[in-house]
Amino acid sequence: MTHQTHAYHMVNPSPWPLTGALSALLMTSGLIMWFHFNSTTLLMLGLTTNMLTMYQWWRDVIRESTFQGHHTPNVQKGLRYGMILFIISEVLFFTGFFWAFYHSSLAPTPELGGCWPPTGIHPLNPLEVPLLNTSVLLASGVSITWAHHSLMEGNRNHMLQALFITIALGVYFTLLQASEYYEAPFTISDGVYGSTFFVATGFHGLHVIIGSTFLIVCFFRQLKFHFTSSHHFGFEAAAWYWHFVDVVWLFLYVSIYWWGS
C-alpha cells in the first residue's frame, strides 16, 4: 500500500458486493421457485453463495480493522453514520408493512366481510406463544446491554456470558416463531390478513436471524480478544441492530397480534 497522509481508509477493490448482490438475486428467485414450483435448488444455491460471501467479506473487514489498523477514529465515525442510516432505512422498510396492515384493518372492505380479522380467519392468541416471544426478546435486550457494559468495564468473561445468552435467546425466538408458523390456522395465501401477517413477522424473523449471525461473529471475535473497551464498533453495531429488532417486535406484537386479533 502506498504512503498516505490522511486518516481515511482507501478500500481495495473487492468482489464481495457483486457476489452479495448475485446471491440476493438467487435467494429471492429461489424463494419464488420454492413457493410456486416446490423446488428448493435455487434457494439453496443462493443461501450457499450468501454464506460464502458473508464469511469472506467479514474476514476482509476484520483483517483491515483489527490487524492492519485501518479503522481510525475518522473511519469509525463514518461507519457509525452508515449504521445509523441503515437502521433508518430499515425503519422505513417496516413502516411500509405497518401501513399495509393498518390500511387494510382500519377500514375493512366488503370483500373481507366488513370486519377485522376477516370472516373465516382465526387469529393466534396474543397471550400464548407471541407473549413468550416478546418476553424472550426483551430478555435478550437486557443481556446484550449487560454484554456492552461488561465490555466497557473490561470484564471479558461476563461479556462472553451475556453475549452467549443473547444468542441463545435469539435462536430460541426463531424456533418458537417457526413452530408458530407451522401450527398457524391460516396461510400466507389467506387474503390480506395472511399476507400482512406472514410478510411482516417473516421479515422480522429474517432480521432476528441476521442479528443472531452478527452476534455469533462478535462472540467468536471476542474469544480471540478482538474487542477492547475503546475499539469495538463491530459489537456496538450488532447491539444497535439487536435493539432495533427488539423495538420492531414490540410494534408487531401490539399491532398485529394484540390489537389486530
From Swiss-Prot:
**Mutagenesis or variant effect for residue 168 to T:** In subsp. Gazella
Which CDD domains did the record assign?
Answer: Cyt_c_Oxidase_III (cd01665)
Membrane topology qualifier: Multi-pass membrane protein
Q: What is its EC number?
A: 7.1.1.9
Q: What is its main location?
A: mitochondrion
List the GO molecular function terms. Answer: cytochrome-c oxidase activity
Recorded family membership:
Belongs to the cytochrome c oxidase subunit 3 family.
Location in the cell reads: Mitochondrion inner membrane
Mitochondrial matrix topological intervals: 1-15, 67-72, 153-155, 224-232
Self-association and partners: Component of the cytochrome c oxidase (complex IV, CIV), a multisubunit enzyme composed of 14 subunits. The complex is composed of a catalytic core of 3 subunits MT-CO1, MT-CO2 and MT-CO3, encoded in the mitochondrial DNA, and 11 supernumerary subunits COX4I, COX5A, COX5B, COX6A, COX6B, COX6C, COX7A, COX7B, COX7C, COX8 and NDUFA4, which are encoded in the nuclear genome.
Tell me the superkingdom of the source: Eukaryota
Q: Please give the name of this protein.
A: Cytochrome c oxidase subunit 3
Spans traversing the lipid bilayer: 16-34, 41-66, 73-105, 129-152, 156-183, 191-223, 233-256
Query: What is the recorded function of this protein according to its Swiss-Prot or TrEMBL entry?
Result: Component of the cytochrome c oxidase, the last enzyme in the mitochondrial electron transport chain which drives oxidative phosphorylation. The respiratory chain contains 3 multisubunit complexes succinate dehydrogenase (complex II, CII), ubiquinol-cytochrome c oxidoreductase (cytochrome b-c1 complex, complex III, CIII) and cytochrome c oxidase (complex IV, CIV), that cooperate to transfer electrons derived from NADH and succinate to molecular oxygen, creating an electrochemical gradient over the inner membrane that drives transmembrane transport and the ATP synthase.
Q: Which residues lie on this side of the membrane: Mitochondrial intermembrane?
A: 35-40, 106-128, 184-190, 257-261
One cellular-component annotation, GO: respiratory chain complex IV
InterPro entries attached to this UniProt entry = Cyt_c/ubiquinol_Oxase_su3, Cyt_c_oxase_su3_dom, Cyt_c_oxidase-like_su3, Cyt_c_oxidase_su3-like_sf, Cyt_c_oxidase_su3_a-hlx
Catalysed transformations (reactions): 4 Fe(II)-[cytochrome c] + O2 + 8 H(+)(in) = 4 Fe(III)-[cytochrome c] + 2 H2O + 4 H(+)(out)
Q: Name one GO biological process term.
A: mitochondrial electron transport, cytochrome c to oxygen
The record's gene field reads: MT-CO3
